[in-house]
Structures are given as C-alpha cells and as structure tokens.
Amino acid sequence: MHKIFSKNNLIFFVFGAFIFVMIVLQFFVSSENATKVNLSQTFEPISWLHLLGTDDYGRDLFTRIIIGARSTLFVTVLTLIAIVVIGVTLGLFAGYKKGWIERLVLRFIDVGLSIPEFIIVIALASFFQPSLWNLVISITIIKWMNYTRLTRSIVNSEMNKPYIKMAQLFHVPTRTILIRHLTPKIIPAIIVLMVVDFGKIILYISSLSFIGLGSQPPTPEWGAMLQQGRDFISSHPIMLIAPASVIAITILIFNLTGDALRDRLLKQRGEYDESH
C-alpha cells in the first residue's frame, strides 16, 4: 500500500512540475519568434541559440513547441469546460427528473456511443472551416455523452439516500438539491474523467490538425507541426520527432495522473484493490 501511494505521489509531483515548467517557459519565449520567417537561418542545427534547431522557414522549433503548447492546452481546457458544463447539467437533470427527459437523453447517448468517437469528430470537423475553435465544437458535440452518463449514474445512486429524501420531504428547491447536495458528490469522479480525457482531447486536436482540419499555418500547434515535419522526416527528422515526443509525453503524464487520481478516489471510498 505504501508503495502504491508513493508511486501516486511521484506522479502528482511530475504532473505539477510539468504544468509549472510549461507555464514558466511561456515567459521566456516570444510568440513573434514562433511565426517570424527568417530564410537565412533555415534548417539550423541544434545549438544553444536554437535548442531544437530551426524549420524550413528559419523559425525556432523550441519556441514553436512552447508557443504551440499554449494553443493546444488552451483549446483542450476550453473544450473540457464546454464538455463538463453540458454533460454534467444534462446528467443532473436526467438523473433527478427521470421520465421522458431521462429516456430521451439515454437513447441519444446509446446511439452516439455506438459509433467510434474519432470517426464522428472527423465527420463533424470536416463540415466546418478548419480552425482550432471549430475543433472545440466538434469534440464537445461527442464527448459530453460520457459525462452525462457518469453524472446520471452517480445521481441515481444518491437519489435513494436519506439526505435526498429528507430534502424532498421538506420541499427544498430542486436547484438547491442539484447544486448543493448532488453536485459535490459527482465532482471527484468528474475530475478524474477530465484528467484522463485531457490526453485524449490533445490527441484529437493534434490528429485533426495533422490532417488539415484544425490549426492552420503559420499558427504553431503540435499537430500542425507534425504535418509540417512529415515532409522532412528523412533530411531533418527533428521537425517530426520533437512535436511527436511532446505530444506523447503530455498524454502519458495526464493518463498516469488520471490513474493515480482514480486510485486515490477508490481508496477514499474503501474500494481500492491492493492487487491493482
């Protein structure tokens, strides 16, 4: 048990250090250097001046990755906020109100989740003009369903408990029950799902930008940088390896953090399996 939580604490430390480093680095790089073309410095090798070299337009790769993190992570956070607001709200009402509202939401979710998420996201993104903002809409349209289903499940398990029955008996307003009594019960599970989905959404955004449905040049974004580096994989592989590595490391950190949060949540509930 001690080893399990020592491992989790290490993961939390790495997660915090990663976020801290990404924030601090934003103050040491200029967004102008990430887009400014300098044809006299194309394909510069790795050096102290250019930590990852330069690309085919003479732009510093390290700077573009750091500024690209701003675009990728900001859009990911914005997408998660939209997903949580929509998903949790629908889940609360579906679980509390029951009746036709619950049946309608559940049937819609059953249909939506029967199709692979990424296929739907690609189909939706292809209808919009390529941009990061349209990716927010496309991903939100499909991802809210998981949050609605999770929220409804938790609400259903809470509805038969004495504190909810007493609140209803004393005619406590529905809004008060939903916000003050039920919402705190779902927050831990929602946070775990958000952290796990953070990595998935980064992958979606990067993948869609890679195939031309997301960020457009010259905006630095990790997926768009992958698309650009693909053309130089033989002559200058660092242009592909650098953004791919950052994407992989970021997703891994968020996935491990999500697993650690889930383990801690289960431990608090007394459901943790030590053989896990």
Swiss-Prot record:
One of the Pfam families matching this protein, by short name: BPD_transp_1
Membrane topology type: Multi-pass membrane protein
UniProt keyword Transport present: yes
Residue span(s) of domain ABC transmembrane type-1: 69-258
Main subcellular location: membrane
Compartments (UniProt record): Cell membrane
UniProt keyword Iron, yes or no: no
Biological process terms in GO annotation: nickel cation transport; transmembrane transport
Family matches, as PROSITE patterns: ABC_TM1
CDD domains in the record: TM_PBP2
Keyword entries, A-Z: Cell membrane, Ion transport, Membrane, Nickel, Nickel transport, Transmembrane, Transmembrane helix, Transport
Transmembrane segments: 10-30, 73-93, 108-128, 186-206, 238-258
One cellular component term from this protein's GO annotations in UniProt: plasma membrane
Quaternary context: The complex is composed of two ATP-binding proteins (NikD and NikE), two transmembrane proteins (NikB and NikC) and a solute-binding protein (NikA).
Protein role: Part of the ABC transporter complex NikABCDE (Opp2) involved in nickel import. Probably responsible for the translocation of the substrate across the membrane.
PANTHER family: D,D-DIPEPTIDE TRANSPORT SYSTEM PERMEASE PROTEIN DDPC-RELATED (PTHR43386:SF1), OLIGOPEPTIDE TRANSPORT SYSTEM PERMEASE PROTEIN APPC (PTHR43386)
Family: Belongs to the binding-protein-dependent transport system permease family. OppBC subfamily.
Protein name (Swiss-Prot/TrEMBL): Nickel import system permease protein NikC
Organism of origin: Staphylococcus aureus (strain bovine RF122 / ET3-1)
